[in-house]
Every structure is written in C-alpha cells, then in structure tokens.
Curated annotation (Swiss-Prot):
Belongs to the tetrahydrofolate dehydrogenase/cyclohydrolase family. It comes from Streptococcus pneumoniae serotype 4 (strain ATCC BAA-334 / TIGR4). One of its GO terms (cellular component) is cytosol. Catalyzes the oxidation of 5,10-methylenetetrahydrofolate to 5,10-methenyltetrahydrofolate and then the hydrolysis of 5,10-methenyltetrahydrofolate to 10-formyltetrahydrofolate. Coiled coil: none annotated. Keywords: Amino-acid biosynthesis, Histidine biosynthesis, Hydrolase, Methionine biosynthesis, Multifunctional enzyme, NADP, One-carbon metabolism, Oxidoreductase, Purine biosynthesis. It holds the Pfam family THF_DHG_CYH_C. NADP(+) binds at G165, R166, S167, S190. This is Bifunctional protein FolD.
C-alpha cells in the first residue's frame, strides 16, 4: 500500500522542535536568530511566499523583517541594501525573493549576499562547498527532501535515483545530496532521450521539471519512491504537481502530494538554516 509522505505534518513537527531550540538558545546565550527577506516589486506569488516565510520565522521565535522595495529600484540600490544587512550582526539570514525584475542581474544579487548569511544556499561558494562534500548552506528544497527520506526511513544507499530537472535550486543540489548518501544518481532534463524509460529504472524518483502532470504511470517502476517538487495549475486551475498523482500513486511505495508535500518542508529548512547560521556566529566569537 502506498504511503503518503506528509510534508505538512513533518514540517509542523520540525517547526515545533525549532521553536524549542530557539527559546533555549535565547535563554542560554541571549542570541535570537534574525532573518531578513527582501521583496522587490509586488508579484502576487512572491508576496505569498514571503508572507509564509515571515510567519514561519516568527513562529520559530526569530527576529524577522520583510523589506519591501519598489520594482523600480536600481541594481546599485539593491546591492547597497544587501550590504547593509551583510554588515549588521543582528541578522543571520538574508533572502532576496526571486524572481527579480529584468533590469536587475540575479547573479550579481546572489553574489552580493554574505555566504555565511546565504540561507537559500544559492551563492557559488555554498554550491562549491556542497559539491566538494563539505556543505554549510544547502538549498532548502533538496534539504527538505533529504529530511523526508530520513523521517520515513527510506534507505538511499545503493539505490538507483533519477532526478528530473537540472536547476541550481533543486536538480543539481538534489543529485549531489543523493550521491553523498551513496545512491547511484542519474540527472535528467527535458531533452533527455527516452526520459520515461530512464525514469522507470529509478528506485527513487525526484521530479522538478515545472510541467503540470508531466510524469505519468509509464515513468514509474512499481515500488518506487516518488518526490514531486512541482507547483502548477492544471487545466481547471487546480493546484497540481509535476506528477500525475492519480495515475502514479497506486504504483509508488511512497509519494509526496501537492500541495502538502515538499512545499512546507522548504520553508522549514530555511528556518533551520537560519538557526544554524546564528549558532555559527557563537563559534566565531
């Protein structure tokens, strides 16, 4: 029988544990983790994501600030704003909500964030640390998926893992984290030949391709673990993932739903990394 991986329940459990750790940290050291989120413009989806991050930070007992700036902000002004928070020791995590307006160079913005405060894990230095086997900040979606594997007792060693999607945010770091657990990893994408046949060999299938219900039953080996990172709308406007859930769920040993699967874990891992960044400042004193 298929086991549903309940990301919402797991995130709530971890969030509760994080609030306890934060309270203890404050009591013992006086340190309160601080997270600042910079939102450029008024993209409706970005506003929802930022609101959720702020809510989670406050629930964890963090100091939280959302800096809203107009879409007309210049790149130089945005970089100056980031520099201000880089230099302020009260803030341990800095997030710039993506996407950014076209006139702003996204890479320049990510490079401007202090790697020790880059809780998204997108800075090239943190990517390099991950690929060299010494991760500090890990992109939060792959980190959340790894936590799911751990919580549900899913063994990765020696397993065939297929990742569909090669983004720097999910696909590439996901592949590296699976490799670190001794899985045999195939990283695929939309131009992979015979993609369904490649995917059908997977014991572990992680799908992050950004296409509604792209993965159907012929992509999935019976008994596979299926992780759906997608967040799309179907033809009826209903939220759905990159996996055709109704067709695939009966085949899988474990599967994440959309919504309520990977999404809640992403924000929880952002909070955990902010907490860890705060802890590391104690080590540097």
């Amino acid at each position: 029988m298929t086991q549903i991986i309940d990301g919402k329940a797991l995130a709530a459990k971890l969030q509760g544990q994080l609030a306890e750790k934060t309270a203890k940290l404050k009591e013992e050291t006086g340190l309160v983790p601080g997270l600042v989120v910079i939102l450029v413009g008024d993209n409706p989806a970005s506003q929802v994501y930022v609101r959720n991050k702020e809510r989670s930070a406050l629930a964890a007992g963090f100091r939280s600030e959302v800096v809203r700036v107009p879409e007309t902000i210049t790149q130089e002004e945005l970089l100056d704003l980031i520099a201000k928070y880089n230099q302020d020791p009260a803030w341990h995590g800095i997030l710039v909500q993506l996407p950014l307006p076209k006139h702003i160079d996204e890479e320049a913005v990510l490079l401007a964030i202090d790697p020790e405060k880059d809780v998204d894990g997108f800075h090239p230095l943190n990517m390099g640390r991950l690929w060299s086997g010494h991760p500090v900040m890990i992109p939060s979606t792959p980190a959340g998926i790894m936590e799911m594997f751990h919580e549900y007792g899913i063994d990765l060693e020696g397993k065939n893992a297929v990742v569909i999607g090669r983004s720097n945010i999910v696909g590439k770091p996901m592949a590296q984290l699976l490799l670190a657990k001794n899985a045999t990893v195939t990283l695929t994408h939309s131009r992979t030949h015979n993609l369904s046949k490649v995917a059908a060999k997977a014991d572990i299938l992680v799908v992050a391709i950004g296409r509604a219900k792209f993965v159907t039953a012929d992509f999935v080996k019976p008994g596979a673990v299926v992780i759906d990172v997608g967040m799309n709308r179907d033809e009826n406007g209903k939220l759905c993932g990159d996996v055709d859930y109704e067709a695939v769920a009966p085949l899988a040993s474990h599967i994440t739903p959309v919504p309520g699967g990977v999404g809640p874990m992403t924000i929880t891992m952002l909070m955990e990394q902010t907490y860890q960044a705060a802890l590391r400042t104690l080590d540097r004193k």
